[in-house]
Amino acid sequence: MSQFPLSILKTSQPHHQPKSMNAPRSSDARGKRILIDPIDDRISKLPDDVLVMILASLSTEDALKTSVLSTRWKNVWKQVPYLHFDLLSATYESGLIAALSNSVAESITQVINNHNGHLMGCSIHHFAHHCVNGVLENWIRLLTLEKNTRFLSLCNKLGKGRRTNVLRFSPNTFSHPKLATLFLRRYDLVTAHAFKECENLKILKLEGILAEVDVFNTVIASCPSLKVLVLNCMWYNEKTCLKIHNNNLKVLHLDCPHVDCIDVSAALLDIFSIFYFAFAKEQNFVIKAPRLLFNNWTKDLEKVPNMNYNITSHAQEKKNIGHEFVVSGDASYLQKLKSLKVVVDVTNSREVHMLRDILVAWNGVLEELHILFKDNNVPNSKEDSESSIGGTQKKKWEEANLFPNADFRVEVMWMFDFNGSNKKQFALASRFVTQGTVMKKMMIKTSSFFANEKLDNEAVVAKLKELPKGNENLSIECF
C-alpha cells in the first residue's frame, strides 16, 4: 500500500462521476433489489479481510452500496481503511445547494459514525458554508479523535470573495498524535490556532490558502517534525518575510508569488522546488540547505520553475518519504516544473531506480535536465549487489528497456563531473543519445578537469557523437 493513500483514493474512482448519496435512482432501478444466488456467490465466501481489500478499490459510495447485497455484506464496508466524500460531484437544483448539500453532509456524518475501527485516510470535498456552520469542524473531530485518521485531505469549493472560506477552529484541532498527513485546499486562515503544538504532522500541503505571512510563519513553526512542506499560498501583506526554519524537512515546494522575502534554513533538505519569484533584491531570498549542491538560486529564480534533488543524499535514508511523496500523484505541481537538477551515483542501483522514478513521474517534455554525477565508491546493499551480479542492474541499460520510459523527453541536458572512464555514466549518456531522449542539445562539462582527464573525457564525448542519434538534429558539445 502506498504511503500516500489519498492519491490512491483519487485514482480508484470510477471513470464516471458517482451520483450523490441522496440522488434518486434511475427508473429501471426503482423498486428492484440486487439479488445474489447463494449457490453461485463464491465471493461472499471469502474472509472479511479479502472482501475489505476489494471494497477498498471502490469509491466510498460504491462500497456502501454493497451493504444491500446480503446479510454477509451488510457490515463489511465499515472496515475499509479509506473514505472519500465529494459533495461537489452531486447534482443540485438551482437555489437549493445549501439545503441539499447539508442533507448530504448529514449522510457523511452518519457514514463516519457507522464506520468500525480506525481509518488510514479520509478526503472530503465540501462547500464554503460548511466552514461556518460547524459541520467541517465536527467531521475533523470525528476523524481525528474517534477514528484516529492518519491522512486527512480537506478541499473547499471556492467561495465568493475574500473571507468566505475562513477556518475558525479550536486550538490544537490538527494536533492529534495519530494525524501525520494534512492537505488543505482553498481556505482563509485568520489565525494559526488550529495548528498549535502540531508535532505530530510529518506532511503538510497547503494549496490556495490565503493568510497573513505571520500566520504562515506561526503554522510552520508549530510543526517542527515536518518532512514534507508544500506551500501554494497568497497573502494580504507582501512586505513581510516568510520564514521556514526546520531541521527535519526533506521536501520543500514553494509557489507563493509576490512575497517580499523568503528565509529558508533546512539542514536535511534534499528536494527543493520553486515557481517564479521576482525579488526586489538578491538578498531577499536566503536559503541554507547544505545538501542542495546546485546553488545558483538567483539565476534559477529568474529562469523557469525548477526542482533541485540530491538523490545521492536522499537514498541514504532508511525511509524515502520525500521521494515517495514527489513521485506520487499528491505532488500535483511536478509536471508544471520546467527544469530538474539531480545529484546521482549511477553505479548505485537504488539511486538509478530513484532517478527512473522521478523522470517517469514527469511524464512529458522537460526543458532542462542537469545531472551532477557522484562516484561515492560506497558498495550497494547486499540485495543490490546480488541483483547486479544476477544482471538486474545491467538490464537497466539493455536496448530492450527504455530508460526511463518511452514518454520522457528533455530538450537540453547538462552533465557535470562526467567521468568518461565510468562505464555506467557512459551507458546512461549513450542511451539518452540513441533513444532520442535528448531532443536538442547535450552539454558535457570538461573544463573543470586536469589536462589529461580533460583529453580523456573529450575523447569519450567524441564517441558519443559517433553513436546513431535518436534525434538527427541533436548537438553534443563540451563546455
Swiss-Prot record:
Pfam families: F-box (PF00646), LRR_At5g56370 (PF24758). CDD domains: F-box_AtFBL13-like. SMART domains: FBOX (SM00256). Residues 40-88 form the F-box domain. PANTHER family: OJ000223_09.16 PROTEIN (PTHR32153). This is Putative F-box protein At1g67390. It comes from Arabidopsis thaliana. The lineage of its organism: Eukaryota, Viridiplantae, Streptophyta, Embryophyta, Tracheophyta.
